[in-house]
Swiss-Prot record:
Protein name in UniProt: Digeranylgeranylglyceryl phosphate synthase
Entry's transmembrane regions: 21-41, 45-65, 97-117, 135-155, 158-178, 204-224, 226-246, 261-281
Protein family per UniProt: Belongs to the UbiA prenyltransferase family. DGGGP synthase subfamily.
Top-tier EC class: transferase
Pathway: Membrane lipid metabolism; glycerophospholipid metabolism
Subcellular locations according to the entry: Cell membrane
Cofactor: Mg(2+)
Species: Methanocaldococcus jannaschii (strain ATCC 43067 / DSM 2661 / JAL-1 / JCM 10045 / NBRC 100440)
Catalytic activity: sn-3-O-(geranylgeranyl)glycerol 1-phosphate + (2E,6E,10E)-geranylgeranyl diphosphate = 2,3-bis-O-(geranylgeranyl)-sn-glycerol 1-phosphate + diphosphate
Length: 283
């Protein structure tokens, strides 16, 4: 029993179980919003576990491609330490992917399509685009936003979740560029290609453009009469904070400001999520 529990603990470490649970909760939030909190327990469980398994697949694939780097930087991780063999990890990733895709079929065809696209992006990001950030940043934005979209397609009212997905994609894509601006020195040493490395401060204008697009889209659930006034009040506060943060960065485009703005943007994004939840429960 002790050996089994130790092995289980190692596999949970490999999949980064906390990250998987966080992603799954995002999927559930998407489902709650699209179903107006009229939930089906079976669908909720399916959404949770599909997101969990596909996310776990991505984390295992990431460690498979990073095994040589992790031998130096993270030698205690399951693969470089030898606690899990490379072939075992490859088989395990295949099992996780199959479980995720098969379970998504029990939701609907849209869920399957999103699961397949996400699995492909997770593979491509781990293999190639982690160090080529002009595309890698988009993938991170898409994958984060798609968690809500995946849960959303399980419900009846998908439009607000589509808007949440787009706002998440754009704002997180922009935030990733801000983070790259902060990390320029380290990225140069590691041979990473990013927009700030190629274009310097000009890249922050593109990041601002992405965030402003998210701001423009954000009132749509109110304009389309999907959500009420409390949503509009919360989202308006978020929009003002978004614009303030990016204006501050454009005024003082340095590493210290980028670090502060990156953290601030993350806080605002959590308030945006709260606004969508408040809108869905008709407060």
């Amino acid at each position: 029993m002790g050996v089994f529990m130790e092995k289980l603990k190692t596999y949970l470490e490999l999949i980064r179980v906390k990250n998987c649970i966080t992603a799954s909760i995002g999927g559930i939030i998407g489902y709650l919003i699209s179903s107006n909190f009229e939930i089906d327990i079976l669908k909720s469980l399916l959404v949770f576990f599909v997101v969990f398994f596909v996310c776990a697949y991505g984390n295992v694939i990431n460690d498979i491609f990073d095994i040589e780097i992790d031998r130096i930087n993270k030698p205690s991780r399951p693969l470089p330490s030898g606690k899990i063999k490379l072939n075992e990890a490859k088989k395990f990733s295949a099992i996780l992917l199959i479980l995720g895709l098969v379970l998504s079929l029990f939701i609907n065809i849209y869920a399957l399509i999103i699961a397949v696209i996400n699995a492909l992006f997770l593979y491509l990001y781990a293999k190639k685009y982690k160090k080529y950030k002009p595309i890698g940043n988009f993938i991170i934005g898409y994958l984060t936003g798609s968690v809500f979209l995946f849960g959303g397609v399980a419900g009846k009212n998908v439009m607000p979740v589509v808007i949440l997905f787009l706002c998440s994609l754009l704002s997180i894509w922009g935030r990733e560029i801000v983070k790259d601006f902060e990390d320029m020195e380290g990225d140069k040493k590691e041979g990473v290609i990013s927009l700030p490395i190629k274009y310097g401060k000009k890249s922050l204008y593109f990041a601002t453009f992405l965030v402003v697009l998210a701001v423009i889209l954000s009132p749509l659930p109110y304009i389309l009469k999907i959500f009420g006034i409390w949503y509009l009040i919360l989202i308006a506060i978020c929009d003002i904070l978004f614009i303030y943060a990016m204006a501050l960065l454009l005024k003082e485009p340095n590493k210290e400001t980028a670090s502060k703005v990156s953290k601030f943007l993350k806080i605002i994004m959590n308030i945006v999520l709260l606004a969508f939840i408040v809108g869905a429960i008709k407060l």
